[in-house]
Amino acid sequence: MRPIFIVALSVALLGGAVDARHAFSRPGTPRHHGFALALDRVAQEISGRRDVSVRCGTTADPSILGTVTFYGASPGREALLAPPVCSTLRRLWEGRRPSLACTGLGHGQCGQDVLELAWAASALAHESYHLGGVRNEAAAECYGLQSTALVAERLHAPPAYADRLGTYTFWNVRPPVDYGYFSPECHDGGSLDLHPASAEWP
């Protein structure tokens, strides 16, 4: 599951902290096209599975951005993303990207459009790691934050834009320590570093 912890985010459909409930996956892998296929391919690349897909639909609660069902220790084959998440990612895929000038030093706080994109891209990455078998929320969160740039680039963002979004996301949408989504190992060289041989972070 992908939580929201930034109090400043005022969009109703993206507000509040996410609970621990999971929605049920539907059997089979649907045949998607266009944007839906792009989401599937991101999930497949990150999870390392060819049999997974992403569905956009209403979650059990408006505060839940995404879910993956686990059957014992095994993940299902579908990630469910909330409609606001999918709408934001679709805009990115269509080339309607918000300016990231606000992420530069001295430019002040970014607007809701940038925050929404940061949450949405990291939510897809987070749930994709769940599809890959990562059940621990703190690990999925750390891996997802490190993969936000990958998600953005796969959804047609230029590499420089994607990297900037990834850096902004890591430092601005990280959860606090008391919700189960934070790990002290989520840092350069930590045990959750996806690329320990690289000095780049995230």
Language model features with spans:
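Substrate-binding clefts and substrate-entry loops adjacent to catalytic sites
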Residues: 106-108, 125-127, 131, 153
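A metal-dependent hydrolase signature that marks the N-terminal structural subdomain at the beginning
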Residues: 2-109
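Extracellular/mature segments of secreted proteins
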Residues: 62-70, 94-96, 109-119, 152, ...
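Long, well-structured alpha-helical subdomains associated
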Residues: 153-202
